Amino acid sequence: RGHVDYAGTRLVAVCDVDKNHLELGKQLVKDKIAAYHDFRDLILDPNVDIVHIATPPHWHGIMSVEAAKAGKDIWCEKPMTRTIGEGKRVMEAMKQYGRMFRLNTWFRFADPFYGLGTPVKPLKKLVQSGMLGWPLKVTISKHTGFDWKFYWVGKEYLEPQSVPSELDYDFWLGPAPYKPYNPHRVHQTFRGYWDYDGGGLEDMGQHY
């Protein structure tokens, strides 16, 4: 949504392995845009200059490296990768292919500060003025208001269920170990499972 509203960018393509999500992405833009099921097709699109990777983190490293190989710059959601090794490979790829990589920690720039109701711009101005001195230590302790049990707590046992027709579950899993489908593994609640993310700290800690 942010890319649609920002005058400095033009959204030319969307990609998702969930047909319903893909359709929602297409509807965000008034003009006709390309829609892809496979990210490898999107990064070969000559109309694409920058890719915004907003998948679960277990895909971040692979997609970033492949996008760099295809000559695209990358805007990637946090965390950069699930592991340090994956992160190092991404850094190597950026140097090897001469591409730019930007980690999206947009809570630092959003106004008001997401979840806290605190304006960002006055705080940024205060820090930049030097009035607080340097080095500066900031301790974040207030909960953001997210339902942490819903978003960040996995379950020990999940009853296997049928994969919905709109979701390519095998592609969604990608490099992760195979586990039978359950809706709690995908979309909003995937963060509670180490195969895909690292819970609340890995999800939210990097914003601050």
Regions found by a protein language model. Name each.
Residues 73, 81-166:
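A contiguous active-site-proximal alpha/beta segment in oxidoreductase catalytic domains
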Residues 22, 59, 75, 88, ...:
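Tryptophan-centric aromatic hotspots in well-structured domains and transmembrane helices
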